[in-house]
Curated annotation (Swiss-Prot):
Annotated gene: tam9
Highest taxon of the lineage: Eukaryota
Keyword tags: Mitochondrion, Ribonucleoprotein, Ribosomal protein, Transit peptide
Keyword Plastid: no
Protein location: Mitochondrion
Summary of the function given for this chain in its UniProt record: Component of the mitochondrial ribosome (mitoribosome), a dedicated translation machinery responsible for the synthesis of mitochondrial genome-encoded proteins, including at least some of the essential transmembrane subunits of the mitochondrial respiratory chain. The mitoribosomes are attached to the mitochondrial inner membrane and translation products are cotranslationally integrated into the membrane.
Protein name: Large ribosomal subunit protein bL31m
Family the entry assigns: Belongs to the bacterial ribosomal protein bL31 family. Highly divergent.
Organism this protein belongs to: Schizosaccharomyces pombe (strain 972 / ATCC 24843) (Fission yeast)
Length: 86
């Protein structure tokens, strides 16, 4: 917990205002099971990351989700062949 004092002037007199920021350690768990700690102001102890670099199909080409992208490439090539001369 960090605590700092800040002086500010209000109606011609100085006052002391305390500004308190509480930080918590948070564990972020990636899709592949790896985790790391981050200091944050969110009081949640952990976050399960749904989308990260370990489960995105473009970053991890071994994932089966790329089959739909390959299917779109073949559809696009058929479309380009059909309307090539226009």
């Amino acid at each position: 917990m960090k605590c700092s004092l800040r002086l500010f002037e209000k109606a011609g007199r100085l006052s002391v205002r305390s500004q308190t920021v509480q930080t918590f350690q948070q564990r972020i768990v990636l899709a592949n099971g790896a985790s790391y700690l981050v200091n944050t102001t969110l009081p949640k102890p952990y976050i399960l990351s749904i989308k990260d670099i370990t489960n995105m199909p473009l970053n991890n080409p071994k994932v089966n989700a790329l089959s739909s992208i390959r299917g779109q490439e073949s559809r696009r090539s058929k479309f380009e062949e059909r309307y090539e001369g226009l």
